[in-house]
A protein has these predicted regions:
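Aromatic-rich beta-strand edge motifs centered on tyrosine
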Residues: 1-5, 15-24, 36-45, 54-62, ...
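Beta-strand elements of repeat-based all-beta scaffolds
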Residues: 5-10, 24-30, 46-49, 63-68, ...
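Acidic glycine-/aspartate-rich tracts in secreted/extracellular proteins
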Residues: 13, 129, 140-142
Length: 155
């Protein structure tokens, strides 16, 4: 399965580089390649902590639910919209533990971006499988997820 890892992004003229390992961002660097943050990945592939001393925990669907000292809470609806956010702030790993761009709210799934506000991808399926090339998890995110942006999987 191909993966199209994004190696950098530019927001308001500021470039950030990303280093990936096993489908996870493990480090981010500024435009001069100074490390901004480093993430520690657990054996299950989820981000456990970062170099800023934040600790993360997840629910059964892989959604980030607690930050730093477990006094913060985030709750998502089935499509990935935050319904409650107390204290996690700008942690980039949210819905299904996937990298979420704070600027757009889009979830980066390696091959496509997912928009929780519409429950669909913002570009058509590059494989062009099925009838709805923008659909996320065949409209059933309770029982599935799509970590690659190419095809849904049962959770």
């Amino acid at each position: 399965m191909p993966n199209h890892y994004r190696i950098s992004k530019t927001v308001d003229g500021t470039k950030t580089y990303q280093l990936w390992d096993n489908d996870r961002v493990v480090s981010e660097f500024d435009s001069e390649l100074n490390m901004k943050i480093n993430y520690r990945i657990g054996t299950n592939g989820q981000v456990l902590s970062d170099s800023k001393e934040n600790l993360y925990s997840y629910d059964g669907h892989g959604n980030l639910v607690n930050g730093k000292d477990n006094s913060s809470t985030t709750v998502y609806d089935v499509y990935g919209n935050k319904t409650e956010d107390i204290g996690i702030g700008d942690a980039p790993f949210g819905y299904c533990g996937e990298y979420t761009d704070s600027e757009s709210g889009f979830v980066y799934l390696r091959n496509r971006y997912y928009d929780p506000s519409t429950g669909s991808f913002i570009t058509e399926d590059p494989i062009k499988d099925g009838n709805n090339w923008y659909g996320y998890c065949a409209g059933n995110p309770v029982n599935g997820w799509d970590p690659s942006g190419l095809f849904g999987e049962n959770t």
